[in-house]
Amino acid sequence: MSKSENLYSAARELIPGGVNSPVRAFTGVGGTPLFIEKADGAYLYDVDGKAYIDYVGSWGPMVLGHNHPAIRNAVIEAAERGLSFGAPTEMEVKMAQLVTELVPTMDMVRMVNSGTEATMSAIRLARGFTGRDKIIKFEGCYHGHADCLLVKAGSGALTLGQPNSPGVPADFAKHTLTCTYNDLASVRAAFEQYPQEIACIIVEPVAGNMNCVPPLPEFLPGLRALCDEFGALLIIDEVMTGFRVALAGAQDYYGVEPDLTCLGKIIGGGMPVGAFGGRRDVMDALAPTGPVYQAGTLSGNPIAMAAGFACLNEVAQPGVHETLDELTTRLAEGLREAAEEAGIPLVVNHVGGMFGIFFTDAESVTCYQDVMACDVERFKRFFHMMLDEGVYLAPSAFEAGFMSVAHSMEDINNTIDAARRVFAKL
């Protein structure tokens, strides 16, 4: 047995499923998950000594690549002053100043410890600010594991949500309306059925949890207009897209102003950080200045703030996003060409430093139904064959891939060459 297999066997006796987040178990592709010993730049190194070109990037945070010296040094320096104080620090102020400068729609920001905390807190704030209970989310969009968000669509866009995880009371789920991503008609229908009851829409501006599905041109502006028409708040969940699709996020890339924004992943530089913020009048409703309660023992942790501050300063440097886009575009084009040469039907979506691979005969993939029609079994084979070639993709047909500026054009070309060999055998 390999070291990964031995560790996985031991882990399953001690940790549910052997992992601390389900997708890591390779449930979506089968086989034994890799146990990682170290990472540097664009590469992961497993406990058995094999190196992989990494397109998971810790599920998004590693936009600069692994073990970036500026972040590593910031963490070491901060740790020498203490690990946690439970009191305000100067770095929290500097971090808030930087975030609000980089994302102009955020007048104020509250730091938390994860993307889930950010989205659940933003929704609570929207409900408290509007005095309404219902929310709209989209089928196939994931916003963390808060109870009100673990809801799938029923039969039709207006069906009251049913929980898709045991442990979520139906009384919670009934306030979550699930609409179809990229379908404004379904959203208008929900508002017309509940015109005075919907507090907010929460949306991934690029749906990254049904792989990578960009918005149609009219979709995000249409959501903004519907929120304005019916008095609801628009929450853009930029946990995945923030500082990756563009410096000011997908909201800047697509030209849409939300009322609230949720951030995570890149904002922590690899440390556990989330944030939410937006309009000053809305944020003023948050405790201690307002009645909507939110708190956290480790929120604004000095080590995490130092890592995030260092990361964002690097991400804000000229040329970073141009490089991400160039590398991702080359990868997407190369994969399409290699698949076409082999007669493999393939769609590759990409925006900024995100991409998605879909085995499908369709010309495009724009919604959850399109994603579910893709050939998942072929993706599983593709994943394992690419892994054997030394390329680490997300171990699920429903997760986006992530580029970093640490990837070289040689890495991209080697990945395309590996895919060409795999497609020939697929």
UniProtKB/Swiss-Prot annotation:
Keywords (A to Z) from UniProt: Cytoplasm, Isomerase, Porphyrin biosynthesis, Pyridoxal phosphate
GO MF annotations, alphabetized: glutamate-1-semialdehyde 2,1-aminomutase activity; pyridoxal phosphate binding; transaminase activity
Enzyme class: isomerase
GO biological process, alphabetically ordered: protoporphyrinogen IX biosynthetic process
Cellular compartment(s): Cytoplasm
Listed EC numbers: 5.4.3.8
Alphabetical list of Pfam families matching this protein: Aminotran_3
GO cellular component, one term: cytoplasm
Catalytic activity: (S)-4-amino-5-oxopentanoate = 5-aminolevulinate
Pathway membership, UniProt: Porphyrin-containing compound metabolism; protoporphyrin-IX biosynthesis; 5-aminolevulinate from L-glutamyl-tRNA(Glu): step 2/2
Modified residues (N6-(pyridoxal phosphate)lysine): K265
UniProt-listed InterPro entries: 4pyrrol_synth_GluAld_NH2Trfase (IPR004639), Aminotrans_3 (IPR005814), Aminotrans_3_PPA_site (IPR049704), PyrdxlP-dep_Trfase (IPR015424), PyrdxlP-dep_Trfase_major (IPR015421), PyrdxlP-dep_Trfase_small (IPR015422)
Family: Belongs to the class-III pyridoxal-phosphate-dependent aminotransferase family. HemL subfamily.
Subunit structure as annotated in this protein's UniProt entry: Homodimer.
Name of the protein this chain belongs to: Glutamate-1-semialdehyde 2,1-aminomutase
Taxonomic source organism: Escherichia coli O1:K1 / APEC
Gene: hemL
